[in-house]
Amino acid sequence: ELPTFGVGRIHTLFMYPMTFDEFLNANNENGLISMKKQADSQHPLDAAFHEKLIEYFRIYLLVGGMPEAVLAWIKTHNFNQCSHIQEDIILTYEDDFSKYKKRVSPDLLRTTLHGICHQPGEKITFKQISADYRSSQIREAVRLLTLAGLVIPVIATSGNGIPLDAEANEKNMKILLLDSGLL
């Protein structure tokens, strides 16, 4: 059971990690955003700008899009500083798991999240996440992590038309973390 709070006194705002374009904008690289949007097969980016975009993308993959980590990067250009902030964010998420303890063990949520982080971009196998829990328990933990917005399941489909999920195969699934910097 989740704690209650006063109705009408809370304004909900859903926030997500910054996109790559927002990351570029935060780094005052609006010119790169514009060039990237205008580039196509007929008018490709100049090699120098392409290299600069690749470098920024590599940084983005490490720093991620969490606003505090991005701000730390802009101020310090220090990956260690960003890493400390990312660790604090993960610990905050894990501390929050206790509010789900009536439905799922906080240890199971923690184990599932760490297991997902150790299989980035790979087909998820629940046994690799943990041999200590049943698949149904891990599936429920993944469902709660998805509802919380911490992970994004990507389900394979062999559909050739609409709707694509008509031939979805949930046994062949990858699970992405909400932000690459938190890996």
Indicate residue ranges for each PLM-predicted region:
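Accessory nucleic acid-recognition modules appended to NTPase machines
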Residues: V70-L183
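Interdomain motor-coupling "hinge/lid" segment immediately C-terminal to the ATP-binding subdomain
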Residues: L2-H118
